Amino acid sequence: MLFIGKTTEGFPVTVLQAVILGIVQGLAEFLPISSSAHLILVPWFLGWSPSGLAFDLALHVGTLIAVTIYFWRDLLNLAVEGLTKGMKTPTGRLAWGIVLGTVPGAIFGLLMEDVVEAVFRQSILTIALLLAVVGVILYLADRFGPKRRSLEEIRVSDVIWIGLAQALAVIPGVSRSGATITAGLALGLKRETAAKVSFLLGWPIILGGAVLVIPDADPAMFTPSFFAGVAAAAVSGYAVIAALLRYLQRGSYLVFAWYRGLVAAVTVALLLARGM
């Protein structure tokens, strides 16, 4: 999910719900399956009240912590080489690509927050359809993309294009990692390279969302549920990053494309069964 906004209300009722949603967030943020869709669908499946954008932010702070801890050396190298060597090295090019690629997502998120909250977050059917559609696109990109280029061969323009794809992730069901990984595969990046670029590109946009929201937050927002959700998302997110990067050394994204289709089908079936 791409989070930019200033909504500060809305929390699960119990710490247990917060932990469950934190684990869901940690799993779904880094897998191309849409964390925002799962944070809406899981409460809907279980009959809970919607958690709201404020709690979604709390969970994204958790996954931000996971990315920062896992990639702290990479983030430090990006900052140093980006400032000292500009675009003369692969790391420098990636750094400036991330800076430029973050802009579309930030602008789109700020402009579209109210529309997304009013339209997309309220429509379970729309979320299901987007899960399926992006799943098909991910399948095609993984199945037919060249997948030849490594991180050392990346261009600034590649990261900007991936950043444009990231802008679509403000819409639940699209998936920030799904959009960015799919774009990376379509541009010819190796599977593991596409994932790493996706994770690093997400760091500033999630940080920006936290910086915008937390200073204006109601102190009542910082409940035990908030901190339980953050911790659960951080721990599960770190584990998923490590596991996915190992898996992608030999595995593909096809399983996630099929999973998206399965979740979409189950969701539509439940909608029909409930007469909604």
From Swiss-Prot:
It is found in: Cell membrane. It is a multi-pass membrane protein. Bacitracin is thought to be involved in the inhibition of peptidoglycan synthesis by sequestering undecaprenyl diphosphate, thereby reducing the pool of lipid carrier available. GO terms for cellular component: plasma membrane. Its main location: membrane. One of its GO terms (molecular function) is undecaprenyl-diphosphatase activity. It comes from the Bacteria. Keywords: Antibiotic resistance, Cell membrane, Cell shape, Cell wall biogenesis/degradation, Hydrolase, Membrane, Peptidoglycan synthesis, Transmembrane, Transmembrane helix. PANTHER family: UNDECAPRENYL-DIPHOSPHATASE. InterPro entries: UppP. Its EC number is 3.6.1.27. Catalyzes the dephosphorylation of undecaprenyl diphosphate (UPP). Confers resistance to bacitracin. GO terms for biological process: cell wall organization; peptidoglycan biosynthetic process; regulation of cell shape; response to antibiotic. It catalyses: di-trans,octa-cis-undecaprenyl diphosphate + H2O = di-trans,octa-cis-undecaprenyl phosphate + phosphate + H(+). The chain crosses the membrane at residues 13-33, 52-72, 96-116, 122-142, 154-174, 197-217, 225-245, 253-273. The lineage of its organism: Bacteria, Bacillati, Bacillota, Clostridia, Eubacteriales. It holds the Pfam family BacA. The keyword NADP does not apply. This is Undecaprenyl-diphosphatase. Belongs to the UppP family.
